[in-house]
């Protein structure tokens, strides 16, 4: 389902956005526009009026990244993303819960990793001491150092969807949102089985789609966790369980990515920018186009861009 969200912001934030999306800028800019950028499953268009439009399957997720820094009053962005019956209670930050998060969805090279973590309320001070916070604010070395300690402290379930399987499932009509839902649900149910008979006070999923859509994606699954499940964007700032899940998911992704680079016999860049197109073109020259599905998410625009570089 394609969404369209508009936020109102200022020129400073728009400049920050342009810098953030510099590797994804489109050469075309609409009339009255400052820039247009295309990232996986979302097109961002900023206008001189201060309006910024997000279109596509990840419109909500991309818009939510900017809503706290923009001058948007309490508008439809916040409402459309976080206003639902699955919103976490105000006290969730001090509860003993399972948190889940995913990494790798915006990277052309590499797998998708999802991790669910259980954090007992008594462990929250320890996690803070270990430096657990949003993994986006940590470099790979920091991630590795914290993750190695976390692995011995918290119960967790870690899943990796390798590129070949990812592409196979995508070709069968499963979009990225559905694949994420399947992995989150599987990681959560695996962890709950591992923890039994201990039961968490709740489950917090770092929200990537509307909860009703999430459960729609899981309609054919035999085992679906529904009891005390909450969804929130920027879940890592809501409870450290999500931040811990984010760190372990990134740690797993980095390890898998390093293995993939070794397999390719060349360094592979993260993200989905121009440097990725160049690396993919080199990889095709080196190993052949038929090997590409082992390394990349084929539905990304980078596939066609890499092939164009070789023509």
From Swiss-Prot:
Top EC category: hydrolase
Keyword annotations from UniProtKB, A to Z: Cytoplasm, Endonuclease, Hydrolase, Magnesium, Metal-binding, Nuclease
- Co-factor remark: Manganese or magnesium. Binds 1 divalent metal ion per monomer in the absence of substrate. May bind a second metal ion after substrate binding.
CDD domains, alphabetically?
RNase_HII_bacteria_HIII_like (cd06590), RNAse_HIII_N (cd14796)
Cofactor requirements of the protein: Mn(2+); Mg(2+)
Q: What is one term from the GO cellular component aspect held by the record?
A: ribonuclease H2 complex
GO MF terms here are: magnesium ion binding; RNA binding; RNA-DNA hybrid ribonuclease activity
Catalytic reactions on record: Endonucleolytic cleavage to 5'-phosphomonoester
Q: Which PANTHER family match?
A: RIBONUCLEASE (PTHR10954:SF23), RIBONUCLEASE H2 SUBUNIT A (PTHR10954)
Can you name this protein? Ribonuclease HIII
Species of provenance:
Bacillus cereus (strain ATCC 14579 / DSM 31 / CCUG 7414 / JCM 2152 / NBRC 15305 / NCIMB 9373 / NCTC 2599 / NRRL B-3711)
């Amino acid at each position: 389902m394609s969404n369209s969200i508009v936020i109102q912001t200022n020129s400073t934030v728009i400049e920050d956005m342009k810098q953030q999306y510099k590797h994804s800028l489109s050469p075309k800019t609409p009339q009255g526009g400052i820039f247009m950028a295309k990232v996986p499953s979302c097109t961002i268009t900023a206008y001189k009026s201060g309006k910024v439009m997000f279109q596509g399957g990840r419109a909500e997720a991309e818009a939510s990244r900017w809503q706290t820094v923009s001058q948007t009053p309490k508008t439809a962005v916040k409402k459309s993303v976080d206003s639902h019956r699955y919103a976490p209670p105000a006290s969730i930050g001090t509860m003993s819960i399972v948190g889940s998060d995913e990494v790798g969805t915006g990277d052309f090279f590499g797998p998708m990793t999802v991790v669910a973590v259980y954090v007992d309320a008594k462990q929250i001070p320890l996690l803070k001491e270990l430096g657990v916070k949003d993994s986006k604010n940590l470099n790979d070395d920091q991630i590795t150092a914290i993750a190695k300690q976390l692995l011995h402290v918290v119960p967790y379930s870690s899943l990796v969807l390798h590129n070949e399987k990812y592409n196979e499932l995508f070709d069968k009509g499963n979009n990225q949102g559905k694949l994420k839902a399947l992995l989150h649900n599987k990681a959560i149910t695996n962890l709950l089985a591992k923890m039994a008979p201990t039961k968490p006070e709740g489950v917090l999923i770092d929200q990537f789609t509307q909860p009703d859509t999430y459960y729609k994606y899981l309609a054919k699954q035999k085992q679906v966790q529904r009891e005390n499940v909450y969804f929130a964007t920027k879940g890592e700032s809501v409870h450290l369980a999500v931040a811990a899940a984010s760190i372990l998911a990134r740690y797993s992704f980095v390890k898998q990515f390093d293995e993939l680079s070794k397999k390719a016999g060349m360094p592979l860049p993260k993200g989905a920018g121009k440097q990725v197109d160049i690396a993919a073109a080199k990889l095709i020259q080196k190993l052949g186009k038929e090997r590409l599905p082992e390394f990349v998410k084929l539905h990304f625009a980078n596939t066609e861009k890499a092939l164009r570089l070789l023509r």
